[in-house]
Amino acid sequence: SSLEERRAARAARRRKQDENEGGEEQEETTSRRSRRRQQEDEEDSYSAPAEPAYDAEAENRRRQQQEEEEAAARAAEEEYNRQQEELRRQRQEEERQRREEEQRRQQEEEERLRLEREEQEREEEARRMAEEQKKKKKKGLGGLSPEKKKMLKKLIMQKAAEDLANEAKAKAEAKEKYINDLVPKFSTDGKDVAALQALCKDFHKRLASLEEDVYDWEAKIRKQDFEINELTLKVNDTKGKFVKPVLRKVNKTESKLDKIQRKEAKKSDFRDNLKSSREHEADKEGGEGENE
C-alpha cells in the first residue's frame, strides 16, 4: 500500500542520512533522529485511517475514468457504424444510378437501331419503287402484264419469307443441337455431396474449355479483320487513291431478293430468246416460200 511505500522511502532516506553524518555528532543526532522518528511514526499513525478514504476516492476516479473511456469507445463505435451505413447507402445509390444509366443507354441504343431499321426500310421501299418504275418504262419485259408482275413479286416475297423462316429455324435447331452435344443430360437425384462436387468440377472444366475456344475464335476473327483491312489498304495504295471503308449493315433479305430477281431475269431472257428464235425461223420459212 501507499503507507508502506512511504515508510520504506523514509527508511531509505534515514539510512542515507546516517551514512553522510559524521562520528562526533553521532550521539546528538541519534537522539534528534529518534525524536524525529517517533514524531513521524505518530504522524503516520494519525494519517493511517485516512488511507481508505484516499483509496475510495481513487477508485471512484478510476471507475469514472473507465466509464468515460467506455462511453467514448461506444461513441466511436456508433460513429464508425454510422459511417459504414452512410457508405453502404452511398454505394447503393451509385449502383442504382449506374443501373439507370445503363438502362437509359440501352433504350437509346434500341431507339437508334429502330430508327436505322425504319430508315433502311424506307430506302429499300424507295429503291423498289424506283426499280418498278424503271421496269414499267421498258416494253415487252417477259411479256407479263402489270397484274402478273405484281403477283409474281408477291409470290417471290412469300417464298423469300418462307426461306428466311426455314433458315432461322434450321439455325436455331443447329444451335440447340450443338448446345445439347456440349452439355449432356444429367440428373442430381440420389447423388451425395461428393458426386455433386465432381459434377460441378466437370461442368467447370467444360466451361473453361469453352471459354478458351471463345477466346481463340475471337482472336482469329480479329486477326482476319486486321488482314482484310491491310489488304484493303494495299489495294487502295495500288489504285493510287484512298477510299475510307464504309461500315454498313448488310440486309440479308435484300441480297436474297436480288438473287431471286436475277434468276427470274435469266428465265425471262431465255423465254425472250426462245420467242425471238421462233419468229426468226418463221420469217426464214416465209422468205423461202416466196422464193419458190
From Swiss-Prot:
Residues where N-acetylserine is found: 1
Record has DNA repair as a keyword: no
Biological processes annotated in GO: muscle contraction
Region span, Disordered: 1-149, 255-292
Low complexity bias locations: 46-55
Family of this protein: Belongs to the troponin I family.
PANTHER family referenced in this protein's UniProt entry, alphabetically: TROPONIN I
Chain's role: Troponin I is the inhibitory subunit of troponin, the thin filament regulatory complex which confers calcium-sensitivity to striated muscle actomyosin ATPase activity.
Name of this protein: Troponin I
Protein source organism: Chlamys nipponensis akazara
Taxonomic lineage from the root: Eukaryota, Metazoa, Spiralia, Lophotrochozoa, Mollusca
